[in-house]
Amino acid sequence: MTVQQISIFVENKQGTLLKVLELLKEANIQLVASTIADTVEYGIYRIICSEPQRAFATLKGAGISVAISDVFALTLDNVPGRAADAVRILTQEGIGITYMYSFLYEGKGILIFRTDNPDKTR
């Protein structure tokens, strides 16, 4: 299945991430999962949240550089090796993973990922 992910571009300076989190808190938007990928000058803070459209509008309205996109969400049994099994299938099908992160939800492992071939991934 796919879910909407918010990508927030934040400067690598103290307080920038706090501003984003405070805006989401004030809007009563719950974070479900998040990850940060950084470069020298900025980071990309990716989140899965309770209300992605409202989160996008809230952050955009505050002048924050933000994007919304569909990513894949795969629910797995929370046992060793399940992520490897899932990635193996994608690899065998010639599908490359652009990025991936995971979290636990109600005792299940959830993989969030983007691929180089969304149509084939479906």
What are these regions (language model features)?
Residues 1-122:
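A conserved regulatory-domain signal marking ACT and ACT-like small-molecule sensing domains
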